[in-house]
């Protein structure tokens, strides 16, 4: 009797459908908590952050069949570049964001413009 139950249990597990990965899927920063079931051959949740100093970071989240993460330090991502982060558990891309926040980059741009304007003012006064 125990053997029959064991065989039934093994058959039930072997024939049950595999659980698909669930990821947040969105195309912009405004709607980035949107859980969806990924296709069966997609094994990664992928977050791609485009660094845009004037518009802030643009975030895209999706299911992916392959993914390679980029690693960067805060403040070392140049404007116009993208940072990719990957994970492999359900809804793991909910909180993944770029290591270079848009506000920090915007502050750097503002500081650079202020410095340039100051130098131009000093040069104009010296002439």
From Swiss-Prot:
It comes from Mus musculus. The keyword Transcription does not apply. It holds the Pfam family Toxin_TOLIP. This is Lymphocyte antigen 6D. Residues 21-108 form the UPAR/Ly6 domain. InterPro entries: CD59_antigen_CS (IPR018363), LY6_UPA_recep-like (IPR016054), Ly6D (IPR042339), Snake_toxin-like_sf (IPR045860), Toxin/TOLIP (IPR035076). Lymphoid cells lacking Ly6d, called ALP (all-lymphoid progenitor), retain full lymphoid potential and early thymic seeding activity, whereas cells containing Ly6d, called BLP (B-cell-biased lymphoid progenitor), up-regulate the B-cell specifying factors Ebf1 and Pax5 and behave essentially as B-cell progenitors (at protein level). Thymocytes and B-cells. One of its GO terms (biological process) is response to stilbenoid. It is found in: Cell membrane. A lipid is attached at residue 98 (GPI-anchor amidated serine). Disulfide bonds join 23-45, 26-32, 38-63, 67-86, 87-92. Residues 99-127 form a propeptide.
């Amino acid at each position: 009797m125990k053997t029959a139950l064991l065989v039934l249990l093994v058959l039930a597990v072997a024939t049950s459908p595999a659980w698909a990965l669930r990821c947040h899927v969105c195309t912009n920063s405004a709607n980035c908590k949107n859980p969806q079931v990924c296709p069966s051959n997609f094994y990664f949740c992928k977050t791609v952050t485009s660094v845009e100093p004037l518009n802030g970071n643009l975030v895209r989240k999706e299911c992916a069949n392959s993914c390679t993460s980029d690693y960067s330090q805060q403040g070392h991502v140049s404007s116009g570049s993208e940072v990719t982060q990957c994970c492999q558990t359900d809804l793991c891309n909910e909180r993944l964001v770029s290591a270079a926040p848009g506000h920090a980059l915007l502050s750097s741009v503002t500081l650079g413009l202020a410095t340039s304007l100051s130098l131009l003012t000093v040069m104009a006064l010296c002439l």
